[in-house]
């Protein structure tokens, strides 16, 4: 496999997972709002969440971050109840157990492959910030997650 082919394949497999239109999500009716969860509540996470909320087609219903203060700050800003705010390295897994249509991954890049794979495994659509991974094994994990998401009609 050439580097060019790898990059093209990885990019194509992830691209479909980043487009979240209500009419494409299984079970979502036309003009209905998409329930999303945010993984990573730092500055960029709150910024992208604000864009989703301002768009009007999304409800931010769950949050996860390693740090409690970040989750609480974002929860207060977006009106997410305390019982839908999760903390710790694996707090995002509790978020994935919630009734969500999609997740927005804005955590540090070295967590992206594992979090995206777990989100696809949980049947969620994924919007993942770049860089999607920091090494080749992470890129391969993302590529495989994209293939699984396509096979399961998640993108």
Model-derived regions, located:
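N-terminal secretory signal peptides and thylakoid transit peptides that target proteins
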Residues: 1-14
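NAD(P)-binding Rossmann-fold cofactor-contacting core
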Residues: 57-77
């Amino acid at each position: 496999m050439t580097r060019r082919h790898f990059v093209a394949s990885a990019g194509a497999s992830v691209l479909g997972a980043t487009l979240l239109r209500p009419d494409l999500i299984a079970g979502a009716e036309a003009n209905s709002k998409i329930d999303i969860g945010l993984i990573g509540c730092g500055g960029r996470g709150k910024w992208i969440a604000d864009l989703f909320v301002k768009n009007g087609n999304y409800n931010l219903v769950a949050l996860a971050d390693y740090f409690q203060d970040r989750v609480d700050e974002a929860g207060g800003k977006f009106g997410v109840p305390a019982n839908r705010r999760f903390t710790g390295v694996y707090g995002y897994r509790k978020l994935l157990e919630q009734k969500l249509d999609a997740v927005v991954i804005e955590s540090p890049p070295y967590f992206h492959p594992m979090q995206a794979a777990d989100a696809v495994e949980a049947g969620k659509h994924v919007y993942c910030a770049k860089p999607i991974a920091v090494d080749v094994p992470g890129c391969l994990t993302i590529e495989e997650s994209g293939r699984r998401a396509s096979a399961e009609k998640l993108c």
